[in-house]
């Protein structure tokens, strides 16, 4: 554990609720939400910030769980004393989405009627349902209005949904490397990943136990990971070496890297959750043009929209569509396209310019 600039040891907590009515009409009962908090809630409870994670993320956004942890939470560079989300100033909340597999209710949860994991019997969940569960947690913590909701990628979709579903419950909204809806290409990549899982001999219609569809999930992660990088970054990192020319093994370094990413992913993620969460992403849509403007018209908060020049999964054009609709709806919005060669994952990586932008947006309440 490297404590330099870190908030130190953090404990994941759990909140349980009786039920959660879902968008599709079904009811999830009971509902467990795994979450972590960093910093101190002010007496007036006006300094709370909700951080929303991406597809494979979790509630562990900062700090360490134990002295033996080698890596901190997934956004530790941005959350902590003096950082963008300054824990000396703000009370930070991060929860695992429902449908996920990191402590919140999802396919790995025990079905109350069968005593076995839900598996594919878990109800379909949407981005709206994820946000609805987060609202339960925020209220449970005694917070009426959030100072900010922030997230990248899928987390950005959740932040957008917060702005229109609960317009009176947040003052600021930060959307990074995200979109208001998936394009056909974005859906296609997710579908290939899902089909890899469904074709695994251990799939068993989603009712697997210890013999899970690891190979299929690894392939799904390999496909997804390609979209997180940029062509320039892959060329710089791997090039074309070393070409081994063996038909039975991976020929190039990039292949070995993707295999490693896939194999390591299956030890920390569930195949059913991958299907549920990617479907939630694909189904979410606020529309385009006038439809998007109308959807965002109920928002009352300030917006910061950030895109990245080399992000080809959620390219800057999709962020600009959001900005255009916010401006058409006469909303307060600041937009920045950061020059980065790291691809979609840029929002996760330490970037002095990004640190400055996030910190400045939160501190300067008079702009834009």
Curated annotation (Swiss-Prot):
AB hydrolase-1 domain: residues covered: 47-349
Superkingdom assignment: Bacteria
Pathway listed: Amino-acid biosynthesis; L-methionine biosynthesis via de novo pathway; O-acetyl-L-homoserine from L-homoserine: step 1/1
Pfam families assigned to the protein according to its UniProt record, in alphabetical order: Abhydrolase_1
InterPro entries xrefs: AB_hydrolase_1 (IPR000073), AB_hydrolase_fold (IPR029058), HAT_MetX-like (IPR008220)
GO terms for MF: homoserine O-acetyltransferase activity
Major enzyme class: transferase
Ranges annotated as spanning the membrane: none
EC nos: 2.3.1.31
GO-annotated biological processes: homoserine metabolic process; methionine biosynthetic process
Gene3D superfamilies on file: 1.10.1740.110, alpha/beta hydrolase (3.40.50.1820)
Catalytic activity: L-homoserine + acetyl-CoA = O-acetyl-L-homoserine + CoA
Predominant location: cytoplasm
Record localization: Cytoplasm
PANTHER family to which the protein is assigned, alphabetical: HOMOSERINE O-ACETYLTRANSFERASE (PTHR32268:SF11)
Subunit organization: Homodimer.
Protein task: Transfers an acetyl group from acetyl-CoA to L-homoserine, forming acetyl-L-homoserine.
Name of the molecule in the record: Homoserine O-acetyltransferase
Species assigned in the record: Leptospira borgpetersenii serovar Hardjo-bovis (strain L550)
């Amino acid at each position: 554990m490297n404590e330099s600039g870190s908030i130190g040891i953090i404990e994941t907590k759990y909140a349980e609720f009786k039920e959660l009515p879902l968008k599709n009409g079904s009811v999830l009962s009971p509902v467990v939400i795994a979450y972590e908090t960093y910093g101190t809630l002010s007496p007036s409870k006006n300094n709370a910030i909700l951080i929303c994670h991406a597809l494979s993320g979790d509630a562990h956004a900062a700090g360490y769980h134990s002295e033996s942890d080698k890596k901190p939470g997934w956004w530790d560079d941005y959350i902590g004393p003096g950082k963008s989300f300054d824990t000396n100033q703000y009370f930070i909340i991060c929860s695992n989405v429902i449908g996920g597999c990191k402590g919140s209710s999802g396919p790995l949860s025990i079905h109350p009627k069968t005593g076995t994991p839900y598996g594919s019997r878990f109800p379909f969940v949407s981005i709206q349902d994820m946000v609805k569960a987060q609202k339960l947690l925020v209220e449970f913590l005694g917070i009426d209005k959030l100072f900010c909701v922030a997230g990248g990628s899928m987390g950005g979709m959740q932040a957008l949904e917060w702005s229109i579903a609960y317009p009176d419950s947040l003052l600021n909204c930060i959307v990074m490397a995200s979109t208001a809806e998936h394009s056909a290409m974005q859906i296609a990549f997710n579908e290939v990943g899902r089909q890899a899982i469904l074709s695994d001999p251990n799939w068993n219609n989603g009712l697997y136990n210890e013999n899970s569809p690891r190979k299929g999930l690894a392939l799904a992660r390999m496909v997804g990971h390609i979209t997180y990088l940029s062509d320039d970054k892959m060329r710089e990192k791997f090039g074309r070496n070393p070409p081994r020319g063996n038909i039975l093994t991976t020929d190039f370094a990039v292949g070995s890297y993707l295999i490693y990413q896939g194999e390591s992913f299956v030890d920390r993620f569930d195949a059913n959750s991958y299907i549920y969460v990617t479907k939630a992403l694909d189904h979410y849509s606020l529309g385009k043009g006038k439809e998007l403007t109308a959807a965002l018209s109920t928002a009352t908060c300030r917006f910061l929209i950030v895109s990245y020049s080399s992000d080809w999964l959620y390219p800057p054009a999709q962020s600009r569509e959001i900005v255009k609709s916010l401006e058409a709806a006469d909303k307060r919005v600041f937009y920045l396209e950061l020059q980065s060669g790291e691809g979609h994952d840029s929002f996760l990586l330490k970037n002095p310019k990004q640190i400055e932008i996030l910190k400045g947006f939160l501190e300067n309440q008079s702009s834009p």
